[in-house]
Amino acid sequence: MKKNIGNSLALYPTPLVVVGAMVNGKPNWLLVGHLGIIGHDHVMVSLAAAHYTNQGIRESRKLSINIVDEAMLAKADHSGCVSGNKEDKSELFDYILDDAGVPMIFQAPVTMVCSVEDIYETK
């Protein structure tokens, strides 16, 4: 028997994703809870407007999506619990920069460098 759970974000589990972006000349990291595929060549990242990382993403229109593993769980959790406004998170992970200067977590088994096409504001 099916059960109606109402309006719910129920597409779980999702991979553990840390977004990286340059903010004020330094890498910043943010644990992201909502990431989706919207086409064969497009993904969507959902970030609350107040996040410090948004400054860098809006400025450069580039970010990295780093799918991290269990060994990085504590650091990933920290990246989502502490704002870059309050703490320099640039050295939280070992990282490399791509040709455009986008920070990527060196140990992440999967990393994607993305360019922002559109930004949608929600209420």
Predicted regions and their residues:
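Active-site-proximal mixed secondary-structure blocks
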Residues: 1-31, 36-123
